[in-house]
């Protein structure tokens, strides 16, 4: 017996009702957060219902912890650890059952779920920003992050002064 494709394995698991449920990041990568990339269709071949979860990160300094821009893992980890506060914004869409047309053409099903997620993408609350169009690490504003960090430390010290 040969190896089955990931799509085949996913279809078998979904048909069996196995627990835990299948979690798929349909973009297959991370981006700068300015939009939703085209979905890979393998996750939609099984034509199973999809609970679309939209995720966006925000922070007062504008640092985007999911956008790595091909930087090294240690450098990205250091930047993430130095960010004093982070917020994960999560939005759940209603369960999407594929239409007959979507079930027959996985790329159409993927596109429909992608459109739903784009409409449902959470927006950062006032005072918090998600990374928008900056795509280079060199564009990261170190001075802004340092100033934010200093202000946070001052607030902490003021609140915890004896």
Where are these regions (language model features)?
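Catalytic core of membrane glycerolipid acyltransferases/transacylases, capturing the structured
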Residues: 1-4
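A cross-family acyltransferase "interaction/gating" segment
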Residues: 20-21, 28, 32-108, 119, ...
């Amino acid at each position: 017996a040969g190896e089955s494709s990931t799509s085949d394995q996913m279809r078998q698991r979904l048909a069996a009702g196995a627990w835990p449920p299948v979690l798929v990041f349909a973009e297959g990568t991370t981006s700068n957060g300015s939009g939703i990339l085209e979905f890979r269709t393998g996750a939609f071949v099984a034509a199973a219902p999809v609970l679309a979860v939209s995720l966006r990160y925000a922070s007062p300094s504008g640092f985007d912890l999911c956008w790595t821009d091909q930087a090294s893992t240690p450098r990205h980890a250091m930047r993430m650890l130095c960010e004093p506060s982070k917020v994960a914004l999560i939005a759940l869409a209603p369960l999407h059952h594929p239409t007959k047309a979507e079930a027959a053409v996985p790329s159409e099903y993927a596109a429909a779920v992608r459109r739903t997620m784009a409409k449902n993408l959470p927006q950062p609350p006032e005072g918090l920003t998600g990374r928008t169009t900056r795509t280079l690490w060199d564009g990261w504003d170190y001075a802004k992050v340092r100033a934010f960090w200093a202000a946070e430390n001052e607030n902490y010290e003021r609140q915890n002064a004896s």
